[in-house]
Structures are given as C-alpha cells and as structure tokens.
Amino acid sequence: MRAVLETADIAIVALYFILVMCIGFFAMWKSNRSTVSGYFLAGRSMTWVAIGASLFVSNIGSEHFIGLAGSGAASGFAVGAWEFNALLLLQLLGWVFIPIYIRSGVYTMPEYLSKRFGGHRIQVYFAALSLILYIFTKLSVDLYSGALFIQESLGWNLYVSVILLIGMTALLTVTGGLVAVIYTDTLQALLMIVGALTLMIISMMEIGGFEEVKRRYMLASPNVTSILLTYNLSNTNSCNVHPKKDALKMLRNPTDEDVPWPGFVLGQTPASVWYWCADQVIVQRVLAAKNIAHAKGSTLMAGFLKLLPMFIIVVPGMISRILFADDIACINPEHCMQVCGSRAGCSNIAYPRLVMKLVPVGLRGLMMAVMIAALMSDLDSIFNSASTIFTLDVYKLIRRSASSRELMIVGRIFVAFMVVISIAWVPIIVEMQGGQMYLYIQEVADYLTPPVAALFLLAIFWKRCNEQGAFYGGMAGFVLGAVRLTLAFAYRAPECDQPDNRPGFIKDIHYMYVATALFWVTGLITVIVSLLTPPPTKEQIRTTTFWSKKSLVVKESCSPKDEPYKMQEKSILRCSENSEATNHIIPNGKSEDSIKGLQPEDVNLLVTCREEGNPVASLGHSEAETPVDAYSNGQAALMGEKERKKETEDGGRYWKFIDWFCGFKSKSLSKRSLRDLMEEEAVCLQMLEEPPQVKLILNIGLFAVCSLGIFMFVYFSL
C-alpha cells in the first residue's frame, strides 16, 4: 500500500512555505534592490557561510535527490564521482576564475566574453547555448523530478503535478533579488542537510551499517517469480535484474557504460568547468561576496559540503534498492510501466519511496517541503536567468530601440514559451533517460558545454586568444556537438529486452569520449585561428586574463570631480569613448551627443563605469527601467525627470506598490552624495585585498579540501 502524507505532514509543508515567504519579503524590505549590485549581487555584502550554503543548495535540488539516488540504486557508487569532481572545480572557481571576474568588473558571463573578446558574436552564441541548456537539462528535468516527488507522496498524475508546480512557483516567487535567494537558500541548505542526514541514519539502522549496505546491495535482485504472479505480466522476459559487478567502484574500466575513467578525467571534467566556473547561477552567488576572502571561503565551504551527497543521497538510493528491489529494479518495460509509469526503468523513484516508507510522520512533511521549495527556487532562478539572457543578449540586439516595458513583456512571454517547451519535453525525458535521470542531464550537457569550457579556459590562460579564434572554434564545437545530440535523440536506446540495432558510432562511443573530442577540437581550432589572425587589443586583455595585474587602476576620467554632475557627465562620455561596447541605449531617441545638453535633474544613470576593470556602482534607477535593464552590458540609459514623474502620477499608488515590489526605484543624481560614490569605488578596489593571515588559512583549507576529494576518488575507485 502506498504511503501518503498525513495531516501533520501537510501542516508542516504549509508552515515551511510561509516561513520561506516571510524571509523573502524581509529581504525585499531590507535590501537595496534598486541598483545593479544591490539586485544582482546582493550589494556585495554576503558572507562566506551564506554563499557556501547557497552554492550547495542551488546545485543540490530535487533533481539531484531524484537523479543521484536513482543512479545509486541502478549502478552503485559511480555517480558520486560528479560530486567529488565538483569539490575540486569549486576551488578552481574561487582561486582562478572569481578574481578575474572581479578584476574585470563584470556581472554576467556573456558580459565577460564581450569584454574579453569584443563584439557580439560570442555573446549571442553563449546566450543561445545557455537557453538551450536551461530548457533541456534544467527546467524540464526540474519539473519532472518535482512531479515525481508529488506523484509518490500524493499519488497524483505526473502532468497534473507539473502544472501544480508551475502554479505554486508563480504564487510563491519573491522578487527580492539575490539577497532573498541567498537567505532562503541558507535555510533550505540547513534543513536539507539535517533531513537527509536523518534519513541516512534511519536507513543505515534499517540495514545494519555501511559495510552491510555494500554486501546486501550486491544481492539486491528482484523476485522475478513473485513479480510475474503479482502483476500478471504478458511479457515474461526479464533484464537488468542483478546489480552490476563493479557497482562498488566509482571510476571504472575504459569500456564501462556509466563512468569510464579516461572519459571522465579527459572529457567530463572539462565539461563540468562550464557549470562550476562559467554558469551564471553559480558565479553570480560568489560575486555577491564581501571580498575575495569571503568568495574563497564560500567555495571551500561548498567543497566540504559536496562530500555529503555521496553519503546522504547516493547511499540511501542504494539502500532503497535493497529494501524495495521488486519495484526499484523492475524486470522489464511492462513491469516498469505498472510500477512507476515509465518503460525505461524505475530507479528514479528510489529516494521518494525511501522517504515515504521510512521517515516518520512530521519529518516526512518537512523533507517534502524542502524538496519542493528547493525545486521552486531552481525554477524561479531559471525563469529569471533565461528571461534576462534572452531579452538583453538576444532580443535587444535585434531591436535596439526597445523600451524597458517592452523588454519586460518580451521576457515574460519568453518564460511562458520556455515552460510550454519544457512540459512538452517531459515525456521524452521519461523515456530517454533509461531510468537514470542524472546521466541524461550529463549526456546532454556533455554534447554542448565542452566548447564553452575550452573558450573560457583559453580566454583566461592564453592572452593571444582572440575573437575570431574563439568564435570559429566555439561554433565548430557547437555544430559537432549539436549533430551528435540530434543523432542521440534520433537513435534512442532500445528497451532493455530488445536488441540494440543503433549504428556503432552511437552505441559504442560513450558520451564522455565525445565530450573529450569536442573539448580538444574546439581548443585546437581556436588556437590555430587565433595565431592566423591579429591579436586582441591591450584593453581586451588588461583585466580579463589570469596574467593581468593584481591591482585595479582608476583613471582620472572615471574619478569623482568637484561637482557631482560634472563627474557623471565626464564619466559616461569618456568611459564610453574607451569602451569596447559603444552602442549605448538612449531612450526616447536621444543621441549620445545630447547628454551634454541635459540638466543635472534630467539625467539618471543606470550604468556602471568599468574603466580598467573598476566597477563603479550604478548611480540610480528610473522607475521605468527594470533591474535587469540596469546592467545591460555596461550601457547607459537616460530618461528625463519630468517623464518619470508623469509615469508615477499616472500609475498612482498601485504602480508605486508594483515598483517597490519589483525593486524599481528612482533616485536623482543630484541627491546622490559624492561620499556614496567614492565609498562604492573604494569597496570595489578593496575586494581583491587579502590579509596574509587570512590568505594562509584559506590556502590550508584549499589543501585540506583538495586532499579529501582526491582521497575519496581513490578510496571508492580501488
């Protein structure tokens, strides 16, 4: 009989959502969301503890509880390799990538590529690739995994559950900027770890300890005779009923179908560089740190936390197979369809089945609340990130004169379009992932992300890399990966009891080896084309490479002058002349030359002046501009004060409330003090300062966490 949520569980779920909403609204009330740094980078005020927790929970969502546990149930320890690999790559982010992003004065990854290479081609390529990955590996997978949880706990239809999730996300979305996200993520991380540890302890006690888990897992096969009698199956064939012989090893032989060690080291690791070092969702959180020490501390904390999923997710998935082998290890497609609604396999229900069967009333509701809340947080982040990327990096290049309200409308329409595509993709995920959703995510990503990783690594470590090389190398890698992905969709793996008649280059070449080829081919083409074309300018590599100077230089043209207006007028004009991106957005048809003719009260800057990598904080917000518009590739927008007043009067109290809720805020330049501007500049200059004692402690932590990661790889692979 299926276990369901009791009244006490539902009450705890409701209380948890109320608490999360209160935290979000508190962050909305207290935080400054009217500036670029305030909205997108939490005012660069977050500590290492909060960011470390946010990094962990933004990665470990419900799709990981479904996917990691499911792969643990199906194939043993192998899937834990991604977690230990992430532990190491997080330190690459903290010690190499983040200092460069801070020194460059960028907020987004497309912005970094534009600043490093110039032009818009690579920016558009990266934006389009990000949107594809959001739809096919994030949004649709999140919807499917969350729906599985609801289906297991309430017994609802999968697609009814998907629609419910989208509706709940729309109702509970809080637009408090990154402060609210990090605060709620911190709460979710605490409860998620406590809940998962509790489940691990309960399940371990049920089995008899870790050594007993390893022994009994190798014996966890379904009772075929009992299943045939119970389910009255017309198909009496059985397949994949026994655990794999090397299930207790992490990195396996070169021909293994799950984790071949050469493919993982040479292909999967470079591909993962994109997610951990160049994905906006991850990088944005670390950029919110007070300084570089807090940024490094956050990656250390997240690295130590990444030791946990192997034990609190993967191992419980294996225990679920031990306890419920007849369901988790279904014997053929017909049986799988009756158990979980998927002919590909039922290992994905391992974790929710364990929660519903072993966890006591009350704690069960808390676990369900954490899973769904984490899922909705992921959905909200994906919606906002995708909308931002599409409107600013794609749509605005097509329609340069688009107003801010037009961009807001287009962004929301695009989100609706993404939701429709993602829901339509759910049934394909159900059947394509072969019962292991996590490996589906990795396969799709490995066909598309290695070229991006190659471009970022070359951009950072090789000064000679230029725009032409990066573009043609990236496009070559993308085309090859897209062709391979299309073939993978066209030649889908047959059901387990059917012969595999796919072409040899599809069924015999593991996707990690394809990722290896894509990474190195992209790098080779990029190097060759870069050497055959002119080198990048000094301005493009001054602050954007690993070899850049460690200090920031503030030019006089971007420094405060005696009068606020003169400073801002000269800053925008001179910084614009030296900037790579000169296509500034001037609303209402104003030209750049007309700036000099405006009065101080008519000018409202929404831009950071990034000369020589020095990010000066945004100097105000028009009510008609969204926080998203504010950071649009370091571009300036001006609007007359009279027009802003007219819009406010027309909107009345209703629009004032909407503006506050969404974080829109008007602030005249004449009211902005020189002290505020100079303090913000000083903060940016101080972010890269690192006291010797703190640096020593951080380096000791770096050695410790990397040593632990390598030890775990060796221990679980021997």
From Swiss-Prot:
Gene encoding the protein: SLC5A3
Extracellular side: 1-9, 58-86, 145-157, 206-303, 377-406, 463-510, 717-718
Catalytically driven reaction(s): myo-inositol(out) + 2 Na(+)(out) = myo-inositol(in) + 2 Na(+)(in); scyllo-inositol(out) + 2 Na(+)(out) = scyllo-inositol(in) + 2 Na(+)(in)
Record keywords: Cell membrane, Glycoprotein, Ion transport, Membrane, Phosphoprotein, Sodium, Sodium transport, Symport, Transmembrane, Transmembrane helix, Transport
Annotated NCBIfam families: sss
Positions of the record's site feature: Implicated in sodium coupling: 24, 285
Chief location bin: membrane
Organism annotation: Canis lupus familiaris
Tissue: Kidney cortex and medulla.
Sugar-bearing residue positions: 232
A GO BP annotation: regulation of respiratory gaseous exchange
Protein's cellular compartments: Apical cell membrane; Basolateral cell membrane
UniProt record similarity statement: Belongs to the sodium:solute symporter (SSF) (TC 2.A.21) family.
Entry protein name: Sodium/myo-inositol cotransporter
